């Protein structure tokens, strides 16, 4: 799997990759990259499984005012120069599922959800929330 959305990364993905990992791309931006990679793979006479496109983002059941989220958002914006909401979803399970559905609608089918918390107990609680309120409801997602 190859990551990145530069033209060079897209060409590498189409020529050598077996999948692609979005970095901080919005669902719509990821969709454009997916299409370009599929075309690059076709130009290189390579098969590319349409279910080998992924995205990862931080998730927090809570509020943007929660300390772990404020720190993560600040770090994200400082590191990337982009708005934190591109790489973090905060709220409830339905909001996380909405973001996932947006990616699915744009050709992305695999996800890395990174719980946001401080300390083992909070990380465990956030992970439990992901399992209960996202994974257990993933059958609600519609294929594009």
Protein language model regions, located:
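Active-site-adjacent structural elements that line small-molecule/cofactor binding pockets in enzymes
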Residues: 1-144
């Amino acid at each position: 799997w190859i990551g990145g959305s530069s033209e060079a990364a897209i060409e590498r993905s189409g020529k050598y990759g077996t999948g692609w990992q979005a970095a901080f791309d919005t669902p719509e931006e990821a969709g454009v990259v997916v299409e370009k990679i599929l075309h690059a793979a076709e130009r290189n006479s390579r098969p590319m499984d349409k279910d080998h496109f992924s995205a990862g983002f931080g998730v927090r059941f809570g509020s943007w005012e929660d300390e772990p989220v404020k720190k993560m958002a600040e770090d994200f914006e400082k590191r990337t120069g982009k708005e934190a909401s591109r790489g973090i979803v905060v709220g409830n399970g339905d909001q996380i599922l909405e973001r996932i559905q947006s990616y699915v609608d744009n050709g992305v089918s695999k996800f890395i959800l990174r719980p946001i918390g401080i300390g083992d107990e909070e990380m465990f609680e956030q992970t439990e929330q992901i399992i209960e309120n996202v994974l257990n409801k993933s059958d609600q997602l519609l294929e594009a």
